[in-house]
A protein has these predicted regions:
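Amphipathic alpha-helical polymerization modules
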Residues: 1-131, 221-320
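Polar, low-complexity export/assembly segments characteristic of proteins
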Residues: 12, 16-19, 23, 115-245, ...
């Protein structure tokens, strides 16, 4: 009888604990299967939350990249407008040409600053060398960059880093500076050798000249020495081609951002689903538990009353 009383009391205590905590069990021995499921659900949530943090960091990185590319586009647009004015003769007086040259030089400096843009202290266009700026103050490359994989050398891979945003799912985050600024060869006098198709894919060596910077240098030199119509027209075409390249790269970044946005939504939905499963596995139904407590209390009180009647002492037993 005492055993049954204790069992009823333990049942009541367990139910009262569940109501107080809102959880079905407090130690694995209460529900080994449920505890095992909860452990798995918590592990899944931790992984998904890490994927979510990775996706958010990747999105922030690419947002800054997209913003920098947009800024480069604005620089090229302004340079194009100035060059068109010179080509049309709108600005042909020496003092006007000098003002155009000064603005072109300032735009060139701004390009260098954009090329060295950072996100959270990391240079976004510098490949693996995020602790180093892409460009030197003179406009040359400050670092070496591997732009593409070498099929003959397994260790030589493009300096693209990826974030894990799911099981076996990654997203390429960075944009290599060579893809935006390109590179150009120099002659024996150190003058750029312009070709029909700019090079945006070859590996970059430190101190090499970016194509985009060379375009501004050539235009500035021409404005300083005279305005040869052929050279001005060539500068217009180079600015147009450079702008198209920047737009193409910006479009790639935008496509990755769109995909990443969908991935973030998917991860959020997965976290909600697992949280629902975890809640179903762990959390008690308050209405149901209140009813069970009321029933357990009645059972316990009834057992106490029954026990009291069974072991009720007689007057003789009480006196002795």
């Amino acid at each position: 009888m005492v055993y049954n009383l204790n069992q009823n009391l333990r049942t009541l205590e367990k139910l009262q604990y569940q109501k107080a905590t809102g959880k079905k069990f407090r130690v694995p021995s209460d529900d080994p299967i449920g505890a095992s499921k909860s452990l798995k659900f918590h592990t899944d949530i931790s992984k998904l939350e890490q994927y979510q943090r990775n996706a958010e960091d990747a999105m922030s990185w690419m947002t800054d990249t997209e913003s920098a590319l947009g800024e480069i586009g604005e620089v090229l647009k302004r340079a194009y407008e100035l060059t068109i004015d010179v080509a049309n003769g709108t600005k042909k007086a020496p003092e006007d040409l000098q003002k155009v040259k000064e603005e072109i030089d300032q735009l060139r400096e701004h390009l260098i600053q954009i090329g060295n843009t950072t996100y959270a202290g990391r240079h976004i266009f510098s490949g693996y060398k995020t602790d180093q700026p892409l460009l030197n103050e003179d406009g040359t490359y400050n670092i070496d960059l591997i732009m593409k994989k070498d099929e003959n050398d397994a260790d030589k891979k493009a300096e693209i880093f990826e974030y894990n945003v799911g099981v076996s799912e990654t997203v390429k985050v960075n944009t290599l500076g060579g893809k935006v600024f390109g590179k150009i060869g120099l002659d024996n006098e150190g003058k750029p050798i312009f070709v029909e198709e700019p090079d945006y894919t070859s590996d970059i060596d430190e101190k090499e000249m970016p194509y985009l910077i060379a375009v501004f240098d050539a235009l500035s030199d021409e404005l300083d020495s005279g305005t040869n119509p052929d050279i001005i027209q060539n500068s217009i075409k180079r600015l147009q081609d450079s702008h198209e390249q920047v737009l193409a790269v910006r479009s790639e970044v935008g496509a990755k951002m769109n995909r990443l946005e969908m991935t973030e939504k998917k991860i959020g939905a997965q976290i909600n689903n697992v949280n629902e499963l975890l809640s179903y596995n762990e959390d008690v139904d308050m209405a149901e538990i209140s009813m069970q407590i009321a029933m357990a209390e009645n059972v316990y009180i009834s057992s106490l009353m029954t026990g009291a009647k069974i072991i009720q002492p007689t007057l003789v037993q009480f006196l002795t």
